[in-house]
Amino acid sequence: MDQTQYILNKKLVEFLLYSNQDCSLIVIDALITIGANVNYIDETNYNDTPILSVITKTSESNPETVKLLLDKGADVNYQNKYHETALMRTIKYGNFGIAKILLDYGANPYLLDYKNRNSIMIAKEFNVIPMLNIINLYDKKNKDNSDKIRLEIDRIVNIFVD
C-alpha cells in the first residue's frame, strides 16, 4: 500500500470515529471514491475495518453510513483480531436498526468470536432477547421468503428503533 492509499484509509477511519453523529455521507463517499478502502484493516485498533469503527463510535450508529459502507463493498462478515463481526458488536450495543441492516446485507449470525460465541450466544449473554427473535426470523425468512415474516421483523425492529 502506498503512502496516499494509507492516508486515505486512515482519514476514512478517523472521519468515521471522530466526526459528529450526522457525519456527512458526501465526505465518506468522496474518500471512498478517491481511493479509501472500505475493507482497510486498522492494525492499531484491533484490526477493525471502517464498518466496525463506525459501530464502535456509538450505539446510535448512523444507518445511512452503515448502508453506504456496505453498498461500497464493506465485508459484512469480516472478523477482527478477536473474531468479532459487525453484527456481534451491534448486538452488544443493542442497536436493532443496524442489526437489521447487517442481516439484510447477509451478516452470518453463526460465526464464532475468540471465546467461541456466535451472535445468538452474545445476544443471550447481553440479555438482548429481542435480537434473538430478529435472528430467528431471518433464519425463517431465508428458508421461506414470505411477506408475513418480513412484516414481523419490521415490527420487532420498529419497537426498539422508534
Swiss-Prot record:
Pfam families: Ank_2. Keywords: ANK repeat, Repeat. ANK repeats lie at residues 10-40, 47-78, 82-111. Signal peptide: none annotated. Transmembrane segments: none annotated. This is Putative ankyrin repeat protein R664. It comes from Acanthamoeba polyphaga mimivirus. The lineage of its organism: Viruses, Varidnaviria, Bamfordvirae, Nucleocytoviricota, Megaviricetes.
